[in-house]
């Protein structure tokens, strides 16, 4: 190809870093499509969502996939500093800089986070961060300007600021993740750390007006999973208003269900994943009543009822 990337068509079993898929998997896969495209080392399945304009940044974003197995190699300090600086350059609502990220290097804390997330690879991630809402720093700054954070005058503890700070933390994490992918590193976002928010707050010694948002593990990839299928754009992008015809939005759902069902997740490499509709139905019935936000945020000083 003219851009120097490689394009390879395979009609044999698709090799994973963990081995070769079974004949049954191969027959299931090959019946739906006849080749796999290897572009810049990233495996992609055919789909209708084509990017007709491209550059290195777009390629990094289109190749985004969660990496859950890393090589036992440290990330050098210059790369780490660059990733942290990139995160700082993400958008920040009203320039409040109301997030922080805690880098976890203590093996005991890593092990605890792996326990919270029920994911052993967290304990061995070369780079591990927990991004948090941080109005604690701003509360101290406001206090120096004569504002009592405990008073009603201090508005950074209310729901609007909480959600804006949460957004800022996610934007910073995504900037770091994208930069890491552009450098050939792999990442996985760790929402599973929120399985035990009180425990996470305790082990990270999070002060008042802080709250955990997400974790991010980074390292040199030791696996090469296929990029997950994406929903057809017409199901997710609308013009001017939300479509009145809800059923029309779902016209392409059967085809998307089939495409998702053909995908193999390395975590369960012996079977295809469930169709998207089935996943939605299953998750919609999961009881998450124990994951209440108001009381946990209130314990950190936030007042989300206002």
Predicted regions and their residues:
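Short, low-complexity, intrinsically disordered N-terminal modules
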Residues: 3-6, 11, 20, 31
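Acidic, surface-exposed loops and disordered segments
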Residues: 26, 30-306
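Cationic, low-complexity basic patches in intrinsically disordered or flexible, solvent-exposed regions
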Residues: 9, 17, 26
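Charged/polar low-complexity intrinsically disordered segments
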Residues: 11-16, 36
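N-terminal cationic leader/targeting segments used for protein routing and processing
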Residues: 15-17, 22, 50-51
């Amino acid at each position: 190809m003219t851009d120097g990337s490689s394009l390879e068509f395979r009609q044999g079993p698709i090799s994973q870093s963990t081995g070769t898929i079974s004949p049954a998997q191969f027959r299931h896969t090959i019946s739906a499509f006849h080749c796999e495209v290897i572009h810049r080392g990233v495996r992609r399945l055919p789909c209708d969502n084509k990017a007709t304009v491209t550059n290195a940044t777009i390629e990094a974003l289109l190749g985004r996939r969660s990496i859950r197995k890393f090589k036992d190699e440290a990330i050098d300090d210059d790369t780490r500093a660059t990733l942290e600086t990139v995160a700082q350059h993400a958008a920040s609502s009203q320039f409040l800089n109301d997030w922080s990220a805690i880098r976890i290097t203590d093996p005991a804390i890593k092990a605890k986070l792996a326990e919270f997330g029920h994911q052993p690879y967290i304990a061995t991630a070369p780079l591990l961060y927990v991004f948090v809402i941080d109005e604690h720093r701003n509360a101290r700054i406001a206090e120096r300007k004569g504002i009592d954070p405990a008073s009603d005058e201090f508005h950074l503890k209310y729901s609007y600021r909480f959600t804006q700070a949460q957004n800022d933390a996610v934007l910073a994490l995504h900037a770091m993740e994208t930069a890491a992918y552009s450098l050939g590193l792999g990442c996985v976002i760790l929402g599973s750390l929120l399985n035990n928010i009180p425990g996470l707050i305790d082990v990270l010694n999070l002060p008042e007006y802080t709250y955990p948002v997400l974790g991010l593990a980074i390292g040199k990839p030791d696996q090469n999973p296929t990029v997950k299928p994406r929903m057809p754009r017409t199901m997710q992008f609308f013009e001017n208003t939300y479509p009145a015809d809800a059923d029309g939005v779902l016209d392409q759902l059967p085809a998307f269900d089939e495409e998702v069902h053909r995908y193999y997740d390395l975590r369960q490499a012996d079977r295809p994943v469930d169709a998207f509709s089935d996943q939605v139905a299953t998750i919609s019935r999961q009881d998450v009543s124990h994951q209440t936000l108001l009381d946990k945020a209130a314990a950190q000083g936030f007042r989300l009822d206002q």
